[in-house]
């Protein structure tokens, strides 16, 4: 047990997960596209697709665990997913799923960052070091996923 706690502390304090500043996207233009919502087994999912129809962001409610997964396509693993909103930003530990090609982070449904995403003025951004950030409009589908996980 002590080894597991020590490993977790070392990981959280490692340079790979250092709390470097998340870039400011206040003046960034949101990608043209639209959010859609779909009920899925065990929750709901909001997907942002660009104007070419390519999925760019996913917010998924896992109702059984009351968690929200934030994911974006990625060519490779990265230790951190950067989340930016008009009033908050945070680096989140990320996990890569090679089967789906998605890099994701998980938040509890009550995490205040989700409220910041839902209420962000105009846009949100999800970034990964070495890849362009995805700047998407902050539409109601974000709130729908968050609220569904809180019920």
Predicted features and spans:
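Short acidic, glycine-rich loop/turn motifs
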Residues: 50-52, 83-85, 128-130
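Internal interaction segment
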Residues: 22, 87-151
């Amino acid at each position: 047990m002590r080894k597991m706690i020590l490993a977790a502390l070392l990981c959280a304090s490692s340079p790979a997960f250092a709390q470097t500043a998340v870039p400011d996207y206040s003046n960034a233009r949101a990608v043209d596209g639209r959010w859609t919502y779909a009920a899925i087994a065990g929750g709901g999912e909001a997907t942002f697709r660009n104007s070419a129809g390519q999925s760019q962001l996913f917010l998924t409610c896992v109702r059984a665990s009351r968690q929200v997964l934030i994911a974006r396509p990625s060519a490779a693993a990265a230790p951190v997913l950067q989340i930016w909103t008009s009033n908050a930003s945070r680096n989140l530990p990320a996990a890569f799923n090679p089967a789906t090609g998605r890099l994701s982070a998980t938040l509890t449904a009550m995490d205040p960052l989700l409220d910041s995403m839902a209420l962000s003025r105009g846009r949100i951004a999800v970034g990964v070091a070495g890849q362009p950030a995805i700047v998407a409009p902050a539409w109601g589908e974000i709130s729908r996923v968050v609220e569904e996980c809180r019920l």
